[in-house]
Amino acid sequence: MLAFPELSENCIIIDSESKRYSMCGVRIGCLITRSKKIHDAAMLFAQARLSPVLLGQIAATAAHQNDGAYIRAVREEYTHRRNILVDLLNAIPGVICPKPRGAFYCVAELPVDDTEKFAQWLLEKYALNKETIMVAPAGGFYSDPELGKKQVRIAYVLKEEDLKRSVEILKNALKKYREEFSL
């Protein structure tokens, strides 16, 4: 933001402890902007909120007093999970999954007619050894839902073994779905 003064009125940076340190529910973060309009609007909310809960403040302080080892370990773990998930997904016939570079989820194109329909079928009609999976149809993440009609968003927040099992379930589900609906 500082490097591009011509964009300063149109730039907003938002960060939060809940995202940076996986502190679900901790409502501590920051908003950085040079826009007076955005700043004034944010201050209305900030002043109404007063302050975050004490335990959240203590946890956030502790998180900032580390040497970076925690962040490195988390980054390494998510990179490992991402690589496993992307490799396993791309090994399924008809699945295309680019490697994401900055998130903890991937968007994969599936060999189905409609991922909304497929996701519902997974939850209501499919099980492999009494297990199923849930995927998020990607259409809702696009301004034009048709762009994501054959895509799903899959988070890689599970442990490695659970990720592997989930992909095995997906692989079998895709085969059965394509047979059932003659795709």
Set out the residue ranges of the language-model regions.
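PLP-dependent class I/II
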Residues: 1-183
